Amino acid sequence: MSIRRLPEHLVNRIAAGEVVERPASALKELVENSIDAGARRISVSLSEGGLSAIDVADDGCGMTPDEIALALERHATSKLPDDAIEAVTTLGFRGEALPSIGSVADLTIESRVRGADGWHRRVDHGELVGEGPAALPPGTRIRVSNLFAKVPARRKFLRSARAEYAACVDVIKRLAMARPDIGFTLEHEGRRAILVAPDEQRVDRVAALTDRDLAQNSVAVDFRREAVSLTGVAGLPTFNRGVADHQFLFVNGRPVKDRLLIGAVRGAYQDMLARDRHPVIALFVELPGDQVDVNVHPAKTEVRFRDPGLVRGMIVGGLRAALDEAGHRSVQRPSVAALGNWQAGGLPTASSTAPAIPNGFAFGAAAERSGQGSVWDRVADFAPAPMARAEPAYSPPPQQASYPMGVARGQVAATYIVAEAEDGLVIVDQHAAHERLVLERMRRAMADGGVARQALLLPEVVELDEVGCDRLETRIAELAEMGLELERFGPKAMLVRATPALLGQGDVHGLIVDLADELAAYDEALSLKERLDHVAATMACHGSVRAGRTLSVAEMNALLREMEVTPHSGQCNHGRPTWIKLGHGDIEKLFGRK
């Protein structure tokens, strides 16, 4: 077959295959056009998730009749006046959206500029159907119906109306977050799904479109390096989700789903979230136009940075700095909903009455605030349980002090510390909290030149498979800087001579086995310092006090005081909360007083 020029309608359909993948793709292009037109309010109406109809109306600058006709031709645009694609500042610039949509759907455009009459033009799958005067306020209205009706090969790949509607909602959310100065309305089958007013604060806009509790469970991000700025809202690590749908990333006001940015976010949260949990976050990167290429993807959802290392480092560093300021904060969402399942019961019978002072509780004088150095300089290791010290397990409770984490009142199931604060009741998971404290202490020690070692009285032999031993052997020098002294002991064993002093009397065998497993997931080209958080987290887990360990009140208060001054103490190394608080109002609700 000889080479021939394709007809215009077929060219448009091919182009539409790249630009218009589903109703959400068409909606994105239309709303971006409205934003570029200077609209202050944008209204969207959907039918059957956009499969039947998409209506977009705005109060932007509008178009003249000649401009409407020109807008339906390929590569006709008003957004590149100087043909400087490297310095593009608008969301659209190729001039492909309207002709592409018009080639695979029934498209009607109504528009009016201020001081002139309105005009409409209708195109059905690339064929002009009609045009003429139209009555409408200044701005533009566009209706897309019967998408892919004459392209069955494409329509059969569309998903259900519910799935397509969800994709459309995601598009509007992202664009609305990018432009809090614009008001957005989304209706589906006559029901209003989104309504946000113009000129909102960014944090309020993000919270309104994601989770109302985000404002109370997030930190502001504001970081600058050279000509690049990073702003936004980052949820606390304990305020997480099981899917990554609540991560919103923007570059120069453009919503993107860029792997570099997603990886940077994951890196910033890596030791604060479990692998199957994801942060709630909205980040806005602003940088000069010549430092980023937005013309690398048909839908413009991916970008390419001139200096990706700078951007990634900035995101990781900026998020880390913001999360450090959160200190010991954890999710403040009341736990009353979960506790509401409790049923009020009658008084216990005589046979079931518990002792006046349960064995699982230990009361005593509260520890004083520490002076110079760490609280743990005074309580380096947990002291024996009260029974082992031959001292009374009960003494009058201390006076309530103005400590953010409260004063320890007891221990439940030898696992949870119960503390009384001025504004409620604090419950702390002792293992999770101590695990975070040990990790942060190891980080500080590494930053100061290395972790002190604690020699074992009798070196311990740990048997592993040969591959695991090989991995550990290649990292012996690096592990030594972290306080772990190893040497090869035959083909399938490692000899442990010293462990990090910070870990105390931990499970040496379990630590070595877990480290070997961690190293199996590493790129051999990376040093352990580049994976410090992973290695230190593994060590900290084995060096922290376990659930089931009875603590004295002094030990509990020492832990609470260090939590108050330690970054990220609100979540453990796996992203779980280390403490929760029940406010006085929450407790009163449980007892029906409110």
From Swiss-Prot:
Pfam families, sorted: DNA_mis_repair, HATPase_c_3, MutL_C
In terms of domain of life, where is this protein from? Bacteria
Kindly indicate whether the keyword Membrane belongs to this entry.
no
Its recorded name reads DNA mismatch repair protein MutL
* Record-level GO BP terms: mismatch repair
Q: Which family does it belong to?
A: Belongs to the DNA mismatch repair MutL/HexB family.
| A GO CC term assigned to this protein in UniProt | mismatch repair complex
Recorded hits in InterPro entries, A to Z, give:
DNA_mismatch_repair_CS, DNA_mismatch_repair_MutL, DNA_mismatch_S5_2-like, HATPase_C_sf, MutL/Mlh/PMS, MutL/Mlh/Pms-like, MutL_C, MutL_C_dimsub
- Which residues pair up as cystines? none
Q: Which GO terms describe its molecular function?
A: ATP binding; ATP hydrolysis activity; ATP-dependent DNA damage sensor activity; mismatched DNA binding
Please tell me whether the keyword DNA repair is annotated for this protein.
yes
Summary of the function given for this chain in its UniProt record:
This protein is involved in the repair of mismatches in DNA. It is required for dam-dependent methyl-directed DNA mismatch repair. May act as a 'molecular matchmaker', a protein that promotes the formation of a stable complex between two or more DNA-binding proteins in an ATP-dependent manner without itself being part of a final effector complex.
SMART domains linked to this entry: DNA_mis_repair (SM01340), MutL_C (SM00853)
UniProtKB keywords: DNA damage, DNA repair
- What NCBIfam families does the entry give? mutl, PRK00095.2-4
